[in-house]
């Protein structure tokens, strides 16, 4: 019923833009021969992690409903600067919308919160710390926006706090998110 895949940093889950053939879905269909594969959820192209695929079309909606109804508890880890002045654990709630001034970026804005992330610091090594992130909502770039807004931009993030390369620039796999 399910196929669980460990997605690398650079690969989008579904075909998009210049990544039509080089997407996780297209690669899996070619490799497995299962044409009915469909992602149950997505993670950002720059993010590595587990992605669930439905094998049978008749099961897809039931699995997607688990994510939609927030019955799946997602956990992420991130490396970001250590700031002793920020007490952990904490909950970040904010309104996230598309940045009108930035290509494919999101920003926190005033208004009713539409995103929530629970954040804790796992350990510290010099100027860096490892954090665990529990998103309760699923806005685009939510974890990256929340960490950046706290003054804790994730190591290797190509968009936050500033765009490090344009949409047509070549990939730099030496410094992943």
Q: Where are the model-predicted features located?
A:
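RNA pseudouridine synthases
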Residues: 1-177
């Amino acid at each position: 019923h399910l196929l669980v895949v460990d997605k690398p940093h650079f690969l989008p889950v579904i075909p998009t833009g210049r990544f039509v053939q080089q997407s996780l879905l297209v690669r899996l269909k070619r490799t497995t021969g299962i044409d009915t594969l469909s992602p149950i959820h997505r993670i950002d192209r720059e993010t590595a992690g587990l992605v669930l695929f439905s094998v049978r079309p008749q099961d897809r909606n039931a699995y997607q409903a688990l994510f939609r109804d927030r019955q799946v508890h997602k956990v992420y880890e991130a490396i970001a600067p250590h700031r002793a002045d920020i007490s952990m654990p904490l909950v970040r709630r904010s309104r996230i919308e598309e940045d009108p001034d930035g290509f494919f970026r999101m920003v926190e804005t005033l208004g009713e919160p539409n995103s929530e992330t629970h954040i804790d610091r796992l350990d510290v090594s010099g100027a860096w710390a490892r954090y665990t992130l529990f998103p309760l909502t699923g806005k685009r770039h939510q974890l990256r926006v929340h960490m950046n807004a706290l003054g804790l931009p994730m190591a290797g993030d190509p968009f936050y706090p500033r765009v490090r390369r344009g949409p047509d620039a070549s990939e730099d796999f030496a410094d992943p998110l």
